[in-house]
């Protein structure tokens, strides 16, 4: 394996079968568990507009979080290498998901607002 390649692995278990599987669109829960070895389990669901549990993280939350985290970590690394001392960092990120005619959707905008 190339030493520059980093592999990531997880197990995703759908836990939302209420007894009838996906026999109807309304009849199953969107709840699931993401398991990554050595880390706490992450219980997730769909966004409420897709019949998910509003108290759980959804893929859209996690995509926005991943973008914000990547920006933070890159910024901190660049500052450290340039001997710029960062004492605090907060990002108030927002994303816009546009629904498509077929019921799906796509992000059309992500705005990061870091405060250093």
Over which residues does each language-model region extend?
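Extended beta-strand/beta-hairpin segments
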Residues: 1-65, 73-116
